[in-house]
Amino acid sequence: MHTKDQIFAAPIARLGDFCFDEQVVDVFPDMIQRSVPGYSNIISAIGMMAARYAQPQSRLYDLGCSLGAATQAMRRHVTQPGCHITAVDLSHPMIERARAHLSGFKSEVPVELVEADICDIAIENASVVVLNFTLQFVEPEKRAALIQRIFDGLRPGGILILSEKFRFEDAPVNELLIDLHLDFKRANGYSELEISQKRTALENVMRTDSLPVHQARLRDAGFAHQDLWFQCFNFGSMIAIKSSEPAQP
């Protein structure tokens, strides 16, 4: 049984920026399930896609791994020989809790847990890279360089799975999907106070992009094949495939 998220249930006089500290880590499984529509579906599909695209003797990266849900999904599904997962998170409590979670499962796929900024991680010999609701917390001016480094570090035929909360350029549609997401959170037991305080805490640390912005960034990095494969309200996930054919001059 997961600990219930009640971080914002009482009024907070001096509300700081949201951070992935011990308090958040303690309730993270409950928080993510009650806040992100389709999260379980995305995690399951990450495992399925890793099974299809993992290449023998390659690395799989989970960048912003939190408690290791995507890492564990990949471990369960990957059967190619010689694969190795590198799971990275900047939060010390997240990495320590992920280590405890992952140690409870036996797998032939080794995992290296790294406490670091994902913008400082070298991507090498990769067949699968996962950014699961992580890029939105990276400073906007650093995002293109990160995507480029991922592309450069992928083997031909490798994939990037990019899950994000999206902003929509059509104002009425954007407003509708925001409202539907708020209804989703209300239906999952969050009060108006919790919703309001969490939104305020997140506004300076989570900055969302539109789908066309993501698509242009992926295209500019060199991904010839990319599209949205999942969406629920204003949350979704994209897949980008590095062509196995040499780029045309």
Curated annotation (Swiss-Prot):
Which residues make up the binding site for S-adenosyl-L-methionine?
Answer: Y39, G64, C65, S66, D117, I118, N132, R199
Q: Give the EC number(s) listed in the UniProt record.
A: 2.1.3.-
Give the signal sequence positions.
none
Q: Which Pfam families match?
A: Methyltransf_25
Q: List the Gene Ontology MF annotations in alphabetical order.
A: carboxyl- or carbamoyltransferase activity; S-adenosyl-L-methionine binding
Q: Is Transferase tagged as a keyword? A: yes
**CDD domains under this entry?**
AdoMet_MTases
The entry's family comment says: Belongs to the class I-like SAM-binding methyltransferase superfamily. Cx-SAM synthase family.
Q: What is said about its interaction partners and assembly?
A: Homodimer.
**What protein is this chain from?**
Carboxy-S-adenosyl-L-methionine synthase
